[in-house]
Curated annotation (Swiss-Prot):
Source organism per UniProt: Acaryochloris marina (strain MBIC 11017)
EC number(s) reported in the record: 2.3.1.47
InterPro entries: Aminotrans_II_pyridoxalP_BS, Aminotransferase_I/II_large, AON_synthase_class-II, AONS_Archaea/Proteobacteria, PyrdxlP-dep_Trfase, PyrdxlP-dep_Trfase_major, PyrdxlP-dep_Trfase_small
Reaction catalysed by this enzyme: 6-carboxyhexanoyl-[ACP] + L-alanine + H(+) = (8S)-8-amino-7-oxononanoate + holo-[ACP] + CO2
Entry protein name: Putative 8-amino-7-oxononanoate synthase
Binding site for substrate: R21, H132, T361
Keyword Cell membrane part of the UniProt annotation: no
Top-level taxon in the UniProt lineage: Bacteria
Length: 394
């Protein structure tokens, strides 16, 4: 039908811009995996602590299936609520030091459902320009007036507050804690100060901070010592926690309100028993000890120090640049989408899977590297050698 002819043309445009994407089959979640038939060292996983392959999570998931079955069978407000959901929510709240928490079936649903429940067309959203797509889409769906401020630019944010805050009923400040395509952290203490000064709510997305940052791995809020601030703390169960799902932690009134007004929680099937149990086991493991986080940060430091030397910014001929990072996400910026695709393929030819990230996902093309606690030092060394060879040939 002619009504669908535009799709082929749109795909051709995507191909021409070097923006085309396709899925790759990965055999397992570990640091070494088989990718489309090739054994590779995996530097693309968000499984920062290596828990997705941990036998303790698998045993917890199997036990939950034996007790509750494979599915939750309904929405949480109807037939889909299980005691294990409550146990996970209590564990998250204790870990995050909030009054309570609510678990969603994915992090994406948590962001969309929370934002659209809190603000509407009478309200204002001020958001970091580098926020995750789920935050951006939640903002659009809310109908609120949206203004983005330059990445981590609190001066620009304050100017927007001075200009627009008084014209709207409510204001929601929205930010990632760890920016997933850059690896840097939000200026949380400054954001909290502005939220208090201008009577704003503040939502912080801890997707890539949960399990990784802070003394107990509770995230960026703990890392900055801001646990006493009144915040809306969102996070995922699918990255460092090695399972699936999302959560929001905060005051009892906030969570009670979300149970009654958050459409993406009300009108979807509850998180499966297996995923819930695996996430609960992960929270307990992370809270009980810091060994995995210590291993992770050793590997991050090893790679960062080497790349800082090999990708020296003072080299005028160097086309690869290590972007600032305070997390297990390290990004090597390259000049064009074509260049980053070539570099990623060269790494793959050497058995290194580090994906090319291109516009429109990010403003500039880059190789995105994710470090896991289960990576061995020798695997980090292999990556360093491979990146150095790519840099020399670029």
């Amino acid at each position: 039908m002619a009504a669908y002819d535009w799709i082929e043309s749109a795909l051709a445009t995507v191909h021409k811009a070097n923006w085309y994407r396709s899925v790759k089959t990965m055999s397992s979640p570990g640091p070494t995996a088989v990718l489309n038939g090739q054994t590779v060292i995996n530097f693309a996983s968000n499984d920062y602590l290596g828990l997705a392959g941990d036998s303790r999570l698998a045993e917890a998931a199997i036990a939950a299936i034996n007790t509750y079955g494979t599915g939750s069978t309904g929405s949480r407000l109807l037939s889909g609520h299980r005691m294990i959901h409550e146990q996970l929510e209590r564990a998250i709240a204790t870990w995050k030091q909030t009054e309570t928490a609510i678990v969603y079936s994915s992090g994406y649903l948590a962001n969309i459902g929370t934002i659209t429940a809190l603000v509407n067309k009478r309200d204002l959203i001020l958001a970091d320009a580098y926020n995750h797509a789920s935050l951006k889409n939640g903002a659009r769906l809310s109908g609120a007036t949206i203004h983005e401020f330059g990445h981590a630019n609190v001066t620009e944010l304050q100017t927007l507050l001075e200009t627009h805050r008084s014209h709207h009923r409510r204001c929601l400040l929205v930010t990632d804690s760890v920016f997933s395509m850059d690896g840097d952290l939000c200026p949380l203490p400054e954001l909290i100060a502005l939220a208090e000064q201008y009577d704003c709510m503040l939502l912080i997305d801890e997707a890539h901070g949960t399990g990784v940052l802070g003394k107990t791995g509770a995230g960026c809020v703990e890392h900055f010592g801001c646990r006493d601030a009144e915040l809306i703390q969102m996070g995922t169960l699918s990255k460092a926690l090695g399972s699936l799902g999302g959560y929001v932690a905060g005051s009892a009134s906030l969570i009670d309100y979300l149970r009654n007004r958050s459409s993406s929680w009300i009108y979807t099937t509850g998180l499966s028993p297996a995923d819930t149990a695996a996430a609960l086991a992960a929270v307990e493991i992370i809270r009980e000890g810091s060994e995995l986080r210590s291993q992770l940060w050793q590997r991050v430091t090893q790679l960062k120090q080497a790349l800082t030397t090999h990708l020296a910014p003072e080299d005028e001929h160097q086309t690869m640049q290590l972007l600032p990072s305070e997390s297990p996400i390290l990004c090597v910026q390259m000049p064009t989408p074509a260049a980053v695709l070539t570099a990623s393929q060269q790494l793959l030819d050497q058995g290194i899977f580090a994906p090319a990230i291109r516009p429109p996902t990010v403003p500039t093309s880059r190789i995105r590297i994710s470090i896991m606690a289960t990576h061995q030092a020798v695997q980090i060394d292999q990556l360093i050698v491979a990146l150095s060879e790519v840099a020399q040939g670029s």
